Amino acid sequence: MTLKEIIKKGLELGLEAVEVYASTSESNTIKLDEGKLDSYNIKELFSVSIRGLKDGKMGYVTCESLEDGLVEEALHSLATTVEALDATEPEFMYEGGSTYAEVPELISDYKEHPTNEKIEMLKGLEKALLAKSDKIVKVGYCQYSENYNKVQIMNSKGLDLSREYSYIVTYAGALASENGQTVIGMSGDVNTKFGNLELDRIVNEASEEALSKLGAGSIETGHYPVVLKRDVATQLLSAFSSVFSGDSALRKMTILADKEGQKVFGDNINILDDPFYEKALIQSSFDDEGVPCNKKYLVENGVVKGLLHTLKTANFFGKAPTGNGQRAAGSITARPTNLYLQEGSLSKDEIIATVENGIFITEVNGLHAGLNPISGDFNVQSSGFVIKDGKLDRPITLFVLSGNFFELMNNVEEIGNDIEERFTGVACPTLKIKSLAVSGK
């Protein structure tokens, strides 16, 4: 059954509007272990999510094929389900006819390179890591993957959109060992061109990270000036990104629900959601509802400018939809496209040089389990380095970093200029925080 036929059949069953979201994804993953091929996995997934609207109520069904009998059964189930729904807020479908921005094509050349070439690349990566030091005893997670996605959205209101993209990912971990202690350093690269993979950078970063962790000790409990590595700052921003969602506001799960126009963050904090951000891997012209995407400030100079909205939450709050509707199991929620904290002017090393006695946090574990997205509180096991006289002094591990996201964002003293190139979803540069609580020995 074609997408148009699905829509026609849904309307015949009494639905006022019907939308079809067809998604195709392919991934090939090659893993190497001790110079030998460990696994080669190929995944191909296809799904069709069908939404039906009647009397302001929206129902959802999903099929894994377009086989006539399967789709007809799903449509009958959808029509019955919508009738039985008891929705509290009306839902909507977006009409066609909007103008959409042009975005750069993101298509990888991985099909031009044979599998054997990719395996040899991984072998060379593993060999180069082992050659870095006698203390590097093994290479783990030596992996290469290819990813392809295609989406088509069509509805009975004239919407007909499609997008596709593909990219490759390579990463590896160097395991270093000394005096009975084993640590790991990871690095990777996301790219579209196989020949542009930054293998030398992966080798240098993974080996240096692993070797620098050897001999890690403890630190005294106290409050310290803290520098968050960009990876850690990104994890933190990502973990609390739901506070900017209109869905969270609708469920009263964010303190920002009624804070538009109010100063909640520090003067130097600017947080944007920009579907066209040049440092992001994927740029989008429309969301999963077909609404045009646009660049917007969520926080500007510390002032909350607005939240991310779907058609449903925008209607509830009397706002315009922001082009941030994303599908999760058929339903639509408001999520960021490319969310980032705007860069400053200093490099990571320049920021570290401003700290006389503090901590550089390079790794956090169990972040989602140790935070409260409503209050903003977090407690996470961490690792990093002592900073002494503006330089990294010694590695430390197994301490707990505690604080509050909103308080932290009011105590950012320096912002780095090092947002990661080709990031996906959320990004943040290196941040220097005035003080955070550390529980050590």
Where in this protein do the model-derived segments appear?
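Dual-mode signal for accessory low-complexity, basic/Gly-rich regions
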Residues: K259-K441
